[in-house]
């Protein structure tokens, strides 16, 4: 596991130096504290920071082929590299190390950029081909590892994290208004844009080739068609799933350093621990956290699973300095990020790193097996589709606007009047379209956003291209392309890497993902039972039923309590002149939101947290590059790369950002 960074110029005699590449690498030392390597020649510079996992003494990068005409830096783990190496040796290739990195560069010699289609694992890589003066960038199929790039003044910059690019090209710190809008809508910035107009994310499953000053990107992998194979019986389905997931877990146990697993006591992590216990010769090291407030302490469930599988269990009940943690995380995150579960992810990574260098997790189970409540809720509301369209439109356009604003079920009433895909989008939105209360966005900010794209179009485009007919399968596809990548996997990567910990995700092995996608949706969501077949597998491998059929909580944390106590003073920055003078939000709207939460007792946690993360990102990250940062620093026209002919404007979508919850 590493962090990578570099730059390739169209000019052979450019001023790319080792010092410049070193400076880029310095920004991400925590991603690889064990080693640094740099290659500079002919207008190209590649750099890496290494966290040693495999071949501890021989894993230095960059790595080259036999005649040193191709060089690679790479972040990730390739689990099928022993088989690939044997094939390459059979074709006459010679190796000097036992690393997966060297396998990739020899595979590139044989197959060119398409070599990535042979890789099984997680990766973000950069290959410089001296003969062709070409740079190849590639990102793994599901987006487990990040990769950013920017073309600026004839130079192609790339890096695991944006801060490496900004450290040598600070003029690229032009804030992307479209990204800010999408953050406020989703709580994250969806691929491929970033918070900076000139810097982009390479999407999962994509290649980029840079040659002669031109960028060419192409997709090398896509989720397959859903619902293509129906098992003859539940037993057959369980046998196949068990074999595939056990094998995906086994290959992720290869390591030359201590290895363990996150254990929350939920279905996903418990299943992975059960499979690890079967595949391991000794006790599995497991890690769980809880909080001192009893309502947010799930450590007892993890304890039950740990006892069942005789793990070497490590547990920590926390009463953290949450203010200090929030300050630290927002100074490290390069984009506003609104998922508060980054806090427990950071804490469990911090604890695990005291004992291991690699941890397996159960991430991906919800998106693959329909684990979120919103899938079940969506299915329940499909009954309203039997109401004629004219009747739903009449209710939405004529009756609904006359209902009392705070009528119980008003949001539900509006939501079920929408077409099913729009209903799901509205359900996800932080800023639901049905509310027209006191606006939160300033008039000036909405005017800028009016030139941009309706953020809901991100999901609409994925719905349009989903290789699925059943609505549940379409929802799983959309979430895999958006929420999984830009929220869940981003969170896991950033929080684990801040602690120099590698996290591996067996459920998101692409062979498992492809097979599970092909299952009929009723194997995932059956009636009200979410993750049906995964729970049955968990029972089969010994996870106690009391763990499997309790209410899902995930990484639970006392955020409401913190925001009325430990974080209360921090929240007050939202009312400071410095914040309001940025020009994004209407002062009256922010004050009402805060009063509702702190004075009237309404739970506005999600919205306030999202605004707090937005402001702290400005203070702790953005203002390193843009001072003062605010509405005045936005470009005149918002990013328009997501425009489509049928796209309503952002202003139409969010004409009045609501304050009420």
Listing of model-derived features with the role each one plays in the protein:
Residues 1, 41, 167, 198-204, ...:
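Adenosyl-5′-phosphate
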Residues 1-333, 345, 349, 540, ...:
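Cysteine-centered catalytic environments shared across enzyme families
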Residues 35, 146, 269, 365, ...:
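Short hydrophobic/aromatic residue motifs in ordered secondary structure
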Residues 141, 347-407, 483, 488, ...:
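Active-site adenylate/phosphate-handling loop in enzymes that bind or generate adenylated species
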Residues 165, 288-289, 335, 379-387:
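Short beta-alpha connecting loops at secondary-structure transitions
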Residues 259-268, 293-294, 340-343, 368, ...:
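Glycine-rich loop motifs involved in handling phospho/adenylate chemistry
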Residues 293, 317, 336-339, 386, ...:
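Alpha-helix capping and helix-loop boundary segments enriched in small/acidic/polar residues
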Residues 330-332, 373-380, 628-629:
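Short secondary-structure boundary/capping segments
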């Amino acid at each position: 596991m590493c962090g990578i960074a570099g730059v390739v110029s169209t000019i052979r005699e450019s001023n790319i130096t080792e010092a410049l590449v070193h400076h880029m690498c310095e920004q991400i030392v925590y991603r690889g504290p064990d080693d640094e390597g740099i290659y500079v020649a002919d207008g190209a510079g590649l750099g890496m920071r290494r966290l040693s996992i495999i071949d501890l003494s021989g894993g230095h990068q960059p790595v080259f082929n036999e005649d040193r005409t191709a060089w690679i830096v790479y972040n990730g783990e390739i689990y099928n590299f022993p088989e690939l190496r044997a094939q390459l040796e059979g074709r006459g290739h010679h190796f000097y190390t036992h690393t997966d990195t060297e396998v990739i560069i020899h595979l590139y010699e044989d197959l060119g950029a398409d070599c990535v289609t042979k890789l099984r694992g997680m990766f973000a890589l950069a290959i410089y081909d001296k003969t062709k003066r070409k740079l190849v960038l590639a990102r793994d199929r599901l987006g487990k590892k990040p990769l950013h790039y920017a073309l600026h003044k004839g130079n192609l910059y790339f890096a695991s994290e944006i801060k490496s690019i900004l450290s040598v090209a600070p003029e690229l710190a032009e804030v992307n208004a479209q990204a800010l809008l999408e953050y406020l809508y989703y709580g994250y910035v969806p691929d491929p844009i970033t918070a900076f107009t000139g810097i982009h994310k390479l999407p999962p499953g994509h290649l980029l080739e840079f040659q002669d000053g031109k960028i060419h990107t192409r997709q090398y992998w896509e989720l397959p068609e859903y619902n293509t194979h129906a098992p003859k019986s539940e037993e057959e389905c369980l046998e196949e799933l068990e074999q595939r997931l056990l094998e995906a877990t086994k290959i992720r146990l290869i390591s030359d350093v201590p290895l363990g697993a996150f254990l929350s006591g939920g279905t996903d992590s418990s299943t992975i621990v059960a499979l690890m216990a079967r595949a391991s010769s000794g006790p599995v090291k497991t890690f769980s956290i809880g909080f001192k407030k009893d309502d947010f302490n799930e450590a007892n469930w993890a304890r039950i699973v740990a006892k069942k599988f005789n793990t070497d269990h490590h547990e920590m009940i926390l009463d953290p300095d949450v203010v200090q943690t929030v300050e630290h995380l927002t100074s490290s995150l390069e984009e506003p990020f609104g998922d508060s579960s980054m806090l427990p992810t950071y804490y469990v990574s911090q604890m695990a790193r005291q004992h291991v260098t690699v941890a397996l997790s159960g991430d991906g189970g919800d998106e693959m097996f329909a684990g979120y409540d919103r899938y079940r809720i969506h299915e329940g509301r499909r009954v309203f589709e039997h109401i004629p369209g004219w009747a739903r439109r009449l209710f939405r356009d004529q009756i609904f606007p006359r209902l009392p604003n705070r009528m119980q079920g008003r949001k539900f009433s509006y939501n079920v009047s929408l077409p099913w895909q729009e209903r799901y989008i509205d359900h996800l939105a932080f800023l639901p379209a049905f509310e027209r209360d006191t606006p939160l966005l300033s008039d000036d900010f909405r005017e800028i956003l009016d030139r941009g794209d309706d953020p809901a179009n991100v999901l609409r485009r994925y719905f349009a291209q989903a290789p699925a007919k059943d609505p549940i399968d379409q929802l799983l596809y959309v979430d895999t392309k958006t929420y999984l990548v830009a929220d869940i996997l981003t969170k896991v990567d950033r929080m684990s890497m801040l602690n120099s910990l590698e996290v591996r995700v067996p459920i998101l092995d692409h062979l498992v993902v492809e097979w599970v996608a092909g299952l009929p949706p009723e194997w995932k969501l059956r009636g009200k039972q979410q993750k049906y077949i995964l729970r049955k597998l968990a029972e089969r491998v010994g996870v106690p039923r009391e763990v499997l059929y309790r209410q899902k909580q995930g990484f639970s944390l006392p955020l409401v309590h913190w925001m009325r106590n430990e974080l209360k003073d921090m929240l007050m920055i939202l009312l400071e002149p410095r914040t309001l003078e940025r020009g994004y939000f209407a002062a009256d709207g922010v004050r009402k939101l805060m009063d509702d939460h702190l004075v009237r007792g309404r739970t506005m946690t999600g919205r306030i947290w999202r605004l707090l993360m937005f402001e702290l990102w400005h203070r702790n990250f953005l203002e390193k590059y843009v001072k003062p940062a605010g509405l005045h620093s936005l470009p005149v026209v918002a990013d328009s790369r997501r425009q489509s002919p049928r796209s309503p404007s952002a202003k139409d979508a969010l004409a009045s950002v609501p304050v009420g919850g």
